[in-house]
């Protein structure tokens, strides 16, 4: 991993690369938020796909540039698809992120998350309760989300101090952010920088959206508008990326 710390200028540059390169992101996503996540990836510049068909997953992951795996809705068939998708991503060297949603609610889900994390994801992302159960994961970028997002790898600790409280009142903003992280990973090999940049972009977009929204109901479409319209200047002027040596 690179030893450089992410910056607002770097985030703006990576966003421009996403818009120019239009990476394909395959999403094994919580069914509740599939459309919102797909919309977020699309407006930021990526191309999402969402199939969970066991017969199709190999083809879709092979054609994707990155994979995002969310454990929000699980059943036996979904577990088989996730295992195969990760096997294909690893075999082809594609970056992937796993979000161990609600592992604090279900021991079997926690066991499954640990099984997946043993397959060496690029990034593991969850809230404080989830990540406290996951623990340290060597050689993986670890993201703990909250009002301030904390990221770390072996040598760097970074915090993203952007966002808005309405993000917590709209179902799926975190899942959408995971999709945006995957799009950024597809064009930036430094996974911590990619993730920090993606979270800065989504956080600044949320702040800009809140300026024109009246509440959570109008915030959701305003957030998508802001993601679509955010400029490099917006990121440089408003991103708050804090870091210290690990």
Curated annotation (Swiss-Prot):
The record lists the catalysed reaction(s) as: 5-(2-hydroxyethyl)-4-methylthiazole + ATP = 4-methyl-5-(2-phosphooxyethyl)-thiazole + ADP + H(+)
Question: Looking at the keywords, is Iron-sulfur present?
Answer: no
Q: Name one GO biological process term.
A: thiamine diphosphate biosynthetic process
Per UniProt, what is one Pfam family of this protein? HK
Name-wise, this protein is Probable hydroxyethylthiazole kinase
Task: Tell me what organism the protein belongs to.
Answer: Agrobacterium fabrum (strain C58 / ATCC 33970) (Agrobacterium tumefaciens (strain C58))
Arranged from A to Z, the UniProt key words for this protein are:
ATP-binding, Kinase, Magnesium, Metal-binding, Nucleotide-binding, Thiamine biosynthesis, Transferase
On the tree of life, the source organism's domain of life is Bacteria
Q: What is its EC number?
A: 2.7.1.50
Q: Where does ATP bind?
A: 125, 145
Q: Which cofactor does it need?
A: Mg(2+)
Q: In which pathway does it act?
A: Cofactor biosynthesis; thiamine diphosphate biosynthesis; 4-methyl-5-(2-phosphoethyl)-thiazole from 5-(2-hydroxyethyl)-4-methylthiazole: step 1/1
In terms of InterPro entries, this protein maps to: Hyethyz_kinase, Ribokinase-like
Q: Which family does it belong to?
A: Belongs to the Thz kinase family.
Q: Where does substrate bind?
A: 50, 172
Q: What does this protein do?
A: Catalyzes the phosphorylation of the hydroxyl group of 4-methyl-5-beta-hydroxyethylthiazole (THZ).
One MF term in the entry's GO annotations: ATP binding
């Amino acid at each position: 991993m690179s030893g450089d710390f992410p910056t607002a200028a770097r985030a703006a540059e990576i966003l421009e690369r996403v818009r120019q390169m239009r990476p394909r992101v395959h999403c094994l996503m919580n069914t509740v938020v599939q459309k919102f996540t797909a919309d977020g990836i699309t407006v930021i510049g990526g191309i999402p796909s969402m199939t969970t068909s066991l017969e199709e997953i190999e083809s879709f992951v092979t054609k994707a540039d990155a994979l995002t795996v969310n454990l929000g809705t699980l059943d036996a068939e979904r577990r088989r698809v996730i295992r195969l998708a990760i096997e294909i991503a690893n075999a082809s060297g594609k970056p992937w992120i796993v979000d161990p949603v609600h592992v604090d609610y279900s021991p079997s889900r926690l066991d499954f998350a640990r099984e997946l994390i043993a397959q060496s994801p690029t990034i593991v992302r969850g809230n404080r309760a989830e990540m406290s159960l996951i623990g340290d994961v060597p050689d993986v970028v670890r993201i703990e989300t909250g009002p301030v997002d904390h990221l770390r790898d072996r040598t760097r600790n970074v915090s993203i101090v952007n966002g808005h409280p309405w993000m917590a009142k709209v179902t799926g903003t975190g899942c959408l952010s995971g999709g945006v992280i995957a799009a950024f990973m597809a064009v930036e090999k430094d996974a911590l920088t990619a993730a920090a940049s993606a979270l800065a972009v989504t956080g600044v977009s949320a702040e800009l959206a809140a300026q024109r929204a009246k509440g959570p109901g109008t915030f959701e479409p305003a957030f998508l508008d802001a993601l679509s319209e955010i400029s490099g200047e917006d990121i440089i002027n408003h991103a708050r990326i804090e870091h210290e040596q690990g």
